[in-house]
Design a protein with these regions (language model features):
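Hydrophobic transmembrane alpha-helical segments in integral membrane proteins
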Residues: 1-9
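Membrane-interface helix-loop junction between the first two transmembrane segments
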Residues: 14-33
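Generic alpha-helix structural propensity
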Residues: 27-31, 35, 39-43, 47-52
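A transmembrane-helix-recognition feature enriched in membrane-embedded lipid enzymes
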Residues: 35, 40, 196, 200-204, ...
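Membrane-embedded catalytic scaffold of the fatty acid hydroxylase/desaturase
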Residues: 40-49, 67-222
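Juxtamembrane/interfacial segments at transmembrane-helix boundaries in multi-pass membrane proteins
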Residues: 52-72
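A membrane-cytosol interface segment of integral membrane proteins
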Residues: 216-254
Length: 254
């Protein structure tokens, strides 16, 4: 993992350099600083979250007598985990209690490699709910963790505006072009291209969308918070207020 982070840090520096050479304002100091603060703060909880996820998956695996093994088992495990990633991502973009766990990732109005560092500190504690089904299919907990980590690493390098559409890969695997669409502020955009590595799931389930010129990054009506704690908590507060308003409206109609 340290080697991956080193490569990622170098990639950020290169993106900054290329952006300056091309005279493109891809980075905002405050936004970048906030993303980095969020990353390092979340890293402090990362070990605990990862341990919790492994413990929950291992507990679920105890109830399943069959196991996937060998090369075929590894390939199947990756496909299963990638599909579950798609389903989790789709739930995160629905109007449910899970939406606040993902909102902070989409609130930035900038879009560069540091955008991928934006994440809810609470996210690791809901991940087991979505990947436990892999245990029922015979996946090995360590293999699921590895596949999940590989998807996360792959996602690191999708958040860039400098890579154009890659014709042969678009609609097959996730690309920077496809992921840019996902970070658009229109509902039809951020509810599309939800796959982790493969976009086959989006193709099959009708959520694939090609990149167009009308992209504006961020979320309509939601300003990015610069305070780490406010950024982490406010999505849940806003969601709770919305639910209470619906409840009160329902009571008022009777």
């Amino acid at each position: 993992m340290p080697f991956v982070l080193l490569i990622f840090a170098v990639s950020i520096c290169l993106e900054m350099l290329v952006a300056m050479l091309l005279n493109r304002k891809l980075y905002d100091f405050d936004d970048t600083l906030h993303n980095l603060v969020m990353f390092f703060a979340n890293r402090m909880m990362g070990g605990l979250g990862g341990a919790f996820m492994f413990a929950m998956l291992a507990a679920a695996a105890q109830f399943v007598p069959w196991k996937l093994s060998g090369t075929v088992g590894g390939i199947l495990t990756f496909l299963i985990v990638d599909l579950l990633y798609y389903l989790q991502h789709r739930v995160f973009h629905s109007d449910t209690i899970f939406a606040p766990f993902h909102e902070v990732h989409h609130t930035s109005e900038q879009y560069n490699l540091t955008t991928t560092l934006r994440a809810s500190v609470f996210l690791p504690f809901v991940n087991p709910l979505f990947y436990a089904p892999a245990m029922l299919l015979g996946c090995d907990p360590p293999a699921v963790i590895v596949c999940f980590a590989l998807i996360q690493i792959y996602q690191l390098f999708l958040h860039t505006q400098l890579v154009p559409p890659i014709a042969l890969l678009e609609g097959i695997i996730n690309t920077p072009s496809a992921h840019r669409v996902h970070h658009g502020n229109k509902r039809s955009q951020y509810e599309s291209n939800l796959g982790g590595v493969l976009l086959v799931w989006d193709r099959l389930l009708g959520t694939y969308r090609r990149e167009t010129d009308d992209l504006i990054f961020g979320m309509k009506g939601v300003k990015p918070e610069k305070n780490y704690f406010v950024a982490q908590v406010s999505p849940f507060v806003v969601y709770a207020k919305r639910i209470l308003k619906r409840i009160n409206s329902g009571i008022g109609q009777h």
